[in-house]
């Protein structure tokens, strides 16, 4: 089983399939959309088969490993593998992208180009989670941005060029830090290598780690996103189509969280111990600032975009908790938000197709004409506000308890952070339920409610939301369904991070001010 190049096949299948789209005879786009859906389903089936047949849940290290020399002159290798960090996100990518392809059914403008770019994104996103060569990681990270930019700039709204340009400038600017920090890691010391495992084993001075950590944090903070590097996201979501929404919220934001885990925590553990309080503070700012900003938004897309930023704050706090429970909760929050964010933004697209407005002031009373849509909006919003029995509740609870019980911070710091996290949790249902009240209940916009195009959701849309709600509820009632995949890897990562805390005080001779939030290690470090 392990001798077959599963990951390479999974990455290349949608990319190679995309190359055949230009020669498919198709005038109205119907053939090419069925072709793209078939490719997505086959690739997702391969992901599931490779997972069940060749992935050992008890093994924390890399599996399904492949390594082929690509450019021997610079020792660049096509090196891919999957562990507990990458496998859940590879599965999520296949699942969300396949549903996003179904969500793209209404696209009639240049359908061949659209589905061509969708398949390129599919392969590129999986590659980001699978590659184990840091230079190759940078290349696929950059190449994956091109389809996103084109989809935003061609199929977006009135300000699509502004949003697409802002997206590419932010992300490309951040990528420069990936390149500089990655090359520094590769060429530091006696051994020059791009292999991530070999880089993680290097003995890198703490001061250099701090500099590289800051560079990676800026780059991945753009994609997560982290305040104040977040401003591209509301603009991008404000102009994107439904399938682009699903990919942005469901997958692209997770690339930032994954990279923070893989590189900042995994490769630079000493620096992570110093930056951890900073991550906690940034996480709290994300939660509170974005929640208040979301509450003030009148544009439906921007309201949910800021909600996404708020939820990503829990990821940062979980990563900095130094506990198995907290970091596991951060990973679960990424997966949970991928599902919930995709469902909410799909509903935004479905609603806009009928109302042709995004302003909440103009949407009153549409629930009476969209009975099934009413139920779907309610279910997705309840999932987003972390209703017990849904995945968001479990993820946020794990982060809460994991951070509250962390022995890496003093009691005062933990108490303040937990209280502020609680404020964010309270704000979430306020702005989400008020959104539902304005949009679905009233006061009625008679012109809109009586419009002939305001029809209920169709079976295709019900199916897409149903597919997203099944894992949301399934994880909510049985979190082990997902946590068992990544817990061995997360536990190993946490132990590495915890062991690094005392080494900072001894090796870097940091001042008390720099470690004021971190107290000396106790038993278990």
UniProtKB/Swiss-Prot annotation:
**Which keywords, in A-to-Z order, does the entry hold?**
Membrane, NAD, NADP, Plastoquinone, Quinone, Thylakoid, Translocase, Transmembrane, Transmembrane helix
Top EC category: translocase
Instruction: Please give the InterPro entries that the UniProt record associates with this protein.
Output: NADH_Q_OxRdtase_chain4, NADH_Q_OxRdtase_chainM/4, NADH_UbQ_OxRdtase, ND/Mrp_TM
Q: Name one GO biological process term.
A: ATP synthesis coupled electron transport
Q: Where mainly located?
A: membrane
Q: How does it sit in the membrane?
A: Multi-pass membrane protein
Q: Which reaction does it catalyse?
A: a plastoquinone + NADH + (n+1) H(+)(in) = a plastoquinol + NAD(+) + n H(+)(out); a plastoquinone + NADPH + (n+1) H(+)(in) = a plastoquinol + NADP(+) + n H(+)(out)
TM spans, by residue?
4-24, 37-57, 89-109, 111-131, 134-154, 167-187, 210-230, 241-261, 273-293, 309-329, 330-350, 385-405, 416-436, 462-482
- Which Pfam family would be a valid example here? Proton_antipo_M
Record protein name field: NAD(P)H-quinone oxidoreductase chain 4-1
């Amino acid at each position: 089983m392990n001798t077959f190049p599963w990951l390479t096949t999974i990455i290349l299948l949608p990319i190679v399939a995309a190359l055949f789209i230009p020669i498919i005879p198709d005038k109205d786009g119907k053939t090419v959309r069925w072709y793209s859906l078939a490719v997505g389903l086959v690739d997702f089936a391969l992901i599931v088969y490779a997972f069940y047949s060749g992935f050992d849940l008890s093994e924390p290290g890399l599996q399904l490993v492949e390594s082929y020399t690509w450019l021997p002159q610079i020792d660049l290798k096509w090196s891919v593998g999957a562990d507990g960090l990458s496998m859940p996100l590879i599965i999520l990518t296949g699942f969300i992208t396949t549903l996003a392809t179904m969500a793209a059914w209404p696209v009639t403008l240049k359908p061949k180009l659209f589905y061509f770019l969708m398949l390129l994104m599919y392969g590129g996103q999986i590659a980001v989670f699978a590659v184990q060569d840091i230079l190759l990681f940078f290349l696929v990270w950059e190449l994956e941005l091109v389809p996103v930019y084109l989809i935003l700039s061609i199929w977006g709204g009135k300000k699509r060029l502004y949003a697409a340009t802002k997206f590419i400038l932010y992300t490309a600017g951040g990528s420069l830090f990936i390149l500089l920090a990655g090359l520094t890691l590769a060429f530091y010391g006696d051994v020059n290598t791009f292999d991530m495992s070999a880089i993680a084993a290097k003995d890198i001075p703490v001061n250099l780690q701090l500099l590289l950590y800051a560079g990676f944090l800026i780059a991945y903070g753009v994609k997560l996103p982290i305040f104040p590097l977040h401003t591209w996201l509301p603009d991008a979501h404000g102009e994107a189509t439904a399938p682009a929404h699903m990919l942005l919220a469901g997958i692209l934001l997770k690339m930032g969280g994954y990279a923070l885990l893989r590189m900042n925590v995994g490769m630079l553990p000493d620096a992570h111990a110093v930056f951890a309080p900073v991550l906690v503070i940034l996480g709290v700012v994300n939660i509170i600032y974005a929640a208040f900003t979301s509450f003030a938004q009148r544009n439906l897309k921007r309201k949910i975009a800021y909600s996404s930023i708020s939820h990503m704050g829990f990821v940062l706090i979980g990563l900095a908790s130094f506990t198995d429970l907290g970091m596991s909760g951060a990973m679960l929050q990424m997966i949970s938000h991928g599902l919930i964010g995709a469902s909410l933004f799909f509903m935004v697209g479905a609603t806009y197709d009928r109302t042709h407005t995004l302003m909440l002031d103009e949407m009153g009373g549409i629930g009476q004409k969209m009975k099934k849509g009413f139920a779907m909006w309610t279910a997705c919003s309840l999932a987003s506000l972390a209703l017990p029995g849904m995945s968001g509740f479990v993820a946020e609870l794990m982060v809460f308890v994991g951070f509250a019980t962390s022995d890496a911070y003093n009691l005062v710091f933990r108490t303040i952070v937990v209280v502020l996290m609680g404020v964010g949790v309270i704000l979430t249902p306020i702005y989400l339920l008020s959104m539902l009240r304005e949009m679905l209940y009233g006061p009625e916009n008679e012109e809109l409610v009586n419009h002939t195009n305001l029809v209920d959701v169709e079976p295709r849309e019900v199916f897409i939301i149903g597919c997203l709600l099944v894992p949301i509820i399934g994880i909510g009632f049985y979190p082990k369904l997902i946590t068992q995949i990544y817990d061995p890897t997360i536990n190993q990562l946490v132990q590495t991070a915890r062991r690094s805390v005392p080494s900072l005080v001894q090796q870097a001779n940091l001042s008390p001010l720099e470690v004021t939030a971190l107290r000396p290690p106790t038993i278990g470090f």
